[in-house]
């Protein structure tokens, strides 16, 4: 999410601090129109670190999905990993397999949507995203707003 859908300003959990990436609605719509599921997988260690609550992220994600829909595009689902190894809350330090570059969120999406991995693309902006795609054995595309869509 951060760096792809919105500018990565560090631990974004409020819509007031959320800055959309230029042309992102058009990019999402292009994938919708080409029959891809558009699923966001995002590390949100700020929850595990105690910087904000899970409810804050859920509220922001609901707002994001509604805004994207209002622009004629669609997000099928958002998965997030709240994992932080030193979290004071056990559930946030016990699900490391969900945090990218592990593929737990991808495996959940595969199961939930019956996704064919050989027809999937992970679009990201970081080495962690690239490694996640490698680990999941799916194609990776670095986000480049100057390149052609798809």
Enumerate the predicted regions with their spans.
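Asp-based, Mg2+/Mn2+-dependent phosphohydrolase catalytic module
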Residues: 58, 62-76, 86-122, 126-150
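Substrate-recognition element of Asp-dependent hydrolases with the DxDx(T/V) motif
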Residues: 24, 28-64, 73-84
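Active-site neighborhood of HAD-like aspartate-dependent phosphohydrolases
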Residues: 1-39
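Short glycine-enriched, charge-decorated loop/helix-capping segments at active-site entrances
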Residues: 10-19, 52-55, 92-96
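Anionic group-transfer/hydrolysis microenvironments
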Residues: 2, 44-45, 102
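Active-site flanking residues adjacent to catalytic metal/cofactor-binding acidic residues
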Residues: 1, 42, 124-125
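Short, basic/glycine-rich phosphate-binding loops at helix/coil junctions
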Residues: 2-8, 39, 79-91
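Short, active-site-adjacent cap segments at secondary-structure transitions
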Residues: 5-6, 46-49, 85-87, 129-130
């Amino acid at each position: 999410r951060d760096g792809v859908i919105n500018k990565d300003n560090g631990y974004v959990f409020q819509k007031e601090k959320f800055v959309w990436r230029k042309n992102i609605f058009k990019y999402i719509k292009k994938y919708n129109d080409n029959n891809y599921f558009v699923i966001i997988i995002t590390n949100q260690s700020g929850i595990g670190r105690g910087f904000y609550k899970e409810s804050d992220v859920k509220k922001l994600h609901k707002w994001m999905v509604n805004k994207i829909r209002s622009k004629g595009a669609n997000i099928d689902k958002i998965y997030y990993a709240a994992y932080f190894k030193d979290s004071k809350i056990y559930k946030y330090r016990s699900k490391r397999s969900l945090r990218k570059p592990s593929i737990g969120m991808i495996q959940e999406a595969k199961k939930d949507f019956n996704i064919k991995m050989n027809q999937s693309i992970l679009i990201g902006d970081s080495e962690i995203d690239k490694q996640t795609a490698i680990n999941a054995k799916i194609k990776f595309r670095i986000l480049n707003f100057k390149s052609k869509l798809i």
